[in-house]
């Protein structure tokens, strides 16, 4: 409680004034002047502020690294202009994606109908459900790009890539929807497949895992980059392999060719996620990354060996589990960490996917096609008469 000090009564006796040593002294604005009530309140509030605020200062200094500590996420007033290029490796990834552009209209599905009719019921069941997962998952990837990554990342080169990735994911989703629309004639079954996130528990489980990362406000950008590298690198891997298995059997040329194009694009998107991870100053720990990757592996293994077993199309479930682990190890290495499972690739036909194809360009467009001149340097496009032959 604040105490009020009563001011000294004025001295009126002339004799006292003569004897007083305080005669002629002014006490106004001196240190020993009793403070007024308003001044006392100010002093009390300042003291209280010091008492309650000072202990919190060390906590502020020791806080976790924020956006300002990450060059990728820091406010960038020059983000509206592309040149001059600052991150050349990220820009090259964008140009590589741009050179790989394709559209759904370029895929010939005319031979697929006859093949589809000749497939066993369990093979048709498997393919249709894999396509349903793919059609929904590309939309989820785009949701993350639009809602989170494109808004968080401030460097122009990465924003260019994310913008182009959004366009390509739309084309992938269109392609998968077109495949379902072409193969499935029953309207009710078609509707069931288009709403796979709601109608198919095995697809919903994978979708929920990805959607949870989009909505997680506590997870760092680095953790979410790893999670979506797992979505595009692990969640898609087994399904891609199962469709390439059909190619090995000479089935469904339109489906398998679109699978080549899409798997190449998703591989590039996964590589880009790893590149962004490498540019981070404050990365998640290896233990945290392993936890995210292993979680994704378990969900994908369950999806393709229990919920939608690959044995339906004649593949070995045990080998599929091993292949998913092999893909996860490759992703861990690309992120800069050590392998988790240390297994070999059990599918020899998947080794050829990374090699340059020898397809006759005049028979059909090759899966490793790139647009003319996009990846070449200015000097490569110049005309000269003194070139060496």
Curated annotation (Swiss-Prot):
Q: Under what conditions is it induced?
A: Up-regulated in response to DNA damage induced by doxorubicin, camptothecin, UV-C, methyl methanesulfonate, nocodazole, or gamma-irradiation.
Record keywords: Metal-binding included?
Answer: yes
Which CDD domains does this one have? RNRR2 (cd01049)
The main location is: cytoplasm
- Binding positions for Fe cation 1 per the UniProt entry: 138, 169, 172
Q: What would be one Gene Ontology cellular-component term for the protein?
A: ribonucleoside-diphosphate reductase complex
The EC code for this enzyme is: 1.17.4.1
Q: Which residues carry this modification: Phosphothreonine?
A: 33
Phosphoserine-modified residues are where? 20
Domain of life from the UniProt record: Eukaryota
Which is one GO molecular function term here? Answer: ribonucleoside-diphosphate reductase activity, thioredoxin disulfide as acceptor
Query: Motif Cy at which residues?
Result: 49-51
Where does the record say this protein resides? Answer: Cytoplasm; Nucleus
Essential cofactor(s): Fe cation
The EC class name is: oxidoreductase
* One family name in Pfam for this protein: Ribonuc_red_sm
| Cofactor binding description | Binds 2 iron ions per subunit.
For this protein, the record's InterPro entries field holds:
Ferritin-like_SF, RNR-like, RNR_small, RNR_small_AS, RNR_small_fam
> Which biological process, per GO, is one annotated for this protein?
positive regulation of G1/S transition of mitotic cell cycle
Q: Where is Fe cation 2 bound in this sequence?
A: 169, 232, 266, 269
Question: How is the protein altered post-translationally, as described in the entry?
Answer: Phosphorylation on Ser-20 relieves the inhibitory effect on Wnt signaling. Phosphorylated on Thr-33 by CDK1 and CDK2; predominantly in G2 and M phase.
The record's catalysed reaction(s) read:
a 2'-deoxyribonucleoside 5'-diphosphate + [thioredoxin]-disulfide + H2O = a ribonucleoside 5'-diphosphate + [thioredoxin]-dithiol
Q: What else is known?
A: Two distinct regulatory sites have been defined: the specificity site, which controls substrate specificity, and the activity site which regulates overall catalytic activity. A substrate-binding catalytic site, located on M1, is formed only in the presence of the second subunit M2.
> Which family does the record assign?
Belongs to the ribonucleoside diphosphate reductase small chain family.
Q: How does it assemble?
A: Heterodimer of a large and a small subunit. Interacts (via Cy motif and when phosphorylated at Thr-33) with CCNF; the interaction occurs exclusively in G2 and early M.
Per its record, how is this protein called by name? Answer: Ribonucleoside-diphosphate reductase subunit M2
UniProt organism field? Homo sapiens
Taxon lineage:
Eukaryota, Metazoa, Chordata, Craniata, Vertebrata
Point out the gene that encodes the protein: RRM2
